[in-house]
A protein has these predicted regions:
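His/Asp/Glu-rich mid-to-C-terminal helical/loop segments that flank catalytic regions of hydrolases
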Residues: 209-233
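Active-site/substrate-binding loop(s) of hydrolase catalytic cores
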Residues: 12, 17-19, 23, 31-176, ...
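Non-catalytic propeptide/linker segments at domain boundaries
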Residues: 1-9, 15
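Generic secondary-structure signature for well-ordered alpha-helical cores
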Residues: 6, 121, 168-171, 226, ...
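Short glycine-rich, acidic/polar surface loops and turns
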Residues: 25, 180-196
Length: 233
């Protein structure tokens, strides 16, 4: 996402350093009263998740009327490479501390997650309200881990509305809407829902999804995300 750092609306900020000293970079837009978070590459080998995030975010920063309206309303925070050491070393899931970073959202023992948490706390202290968190990953089959429908008022069930709309536009793309009850697992999704009671979704793309299919479908997911978010008060 290096080209995005050159976007006129984006500020690049080093949040901290990994265990081996690599920067944890965030891309941040202008301050608004509401913020949407996008995270990626907590698990090093999950390539399709990273590629999906790239195409998704490219659509969010496009010059369409929809994208411009979305960026005018929401502050956006992107941390696309949370585990740079693991990526460099070819690790399966862990950082150089031997920790799965997507199980450190609670203990906050690792410098990579501590760096991201400091920014979240900073925006909290400034009164900026989180409205959505998407965490991009890969797995065997494309699926979206969400909260349960009963966790929100029916008219505020973002995940259901978002994924239903996306499916209508691409019925040939195989993915699962996979609501889960809150658990004790200390991952990003559970942390954001427990702390802020907002839609917090693990966006999983199948390991074998064709790259051209990612480029076709990710912008549609982004467009429908923006539409649903803009409809909410």
């Amino acid at each position: 996402m290096h080209s995005l750092a050159e976007h006129p609306e984006v500020m690049s900020r080093t949040l901290g350093r990994s265990i081996q000293g690599r920067p944890i970079q965030a891309l941040i837009t202008a301050t608004k009263s509401e913020v949407v978070y996008f995270f990626g590459r907590q698990h090093p080998p999950e390539i399709t998740g990273g590629l999906a995030m790239q195409s998704f975010i490219d659509e969010v920063f496009s010059d369409s009327d929809l994208a411009n309206e979305f960026r005018a309303r929401f502050m956006l925070v992107l941390v696309p490479l949370i585990n740079p050491d693991g990526v460099a070393a070819g690790h399966w899931r862990h950082n150089m501390g031997g920790r799965d970073l997507n199980r450190d959202w609670g203990p906050f023992t690792q410098p990579e997650i501590q760096s991201v948490k400091r920014l979240i706390d900073e925006l909290d202290d400034a009164g900026i309200a989180p409205k959505l968190m998407l965490d991009f990953h890969s797995t065997q089959r494309s699926r979206f881990y969400t909260q349960m429908p009963e966790d929100f008022d029916e008219e505020l069930d973002f995940a259901r509305d978002w994924l239903d709309r996306a499916r209508l536009r691409m019925p040939d793309f195989d993915f699962l809407y996979d609501p889960r009850k809150p658990s004790g697992q200390e991952n990003t999704k559970n942390y954001f829902y427990a702390t802020y009671h907002i839609p917090a979704i693990t966006y999983e793309i199948g390991d074998e999804v064709d790259r051209a299919e990612l480029r076709r479908t990710s912008p549609i997911f982004a467009q429908e995300m923006m539409r649903v978010m803009l409809e909410r008060d």
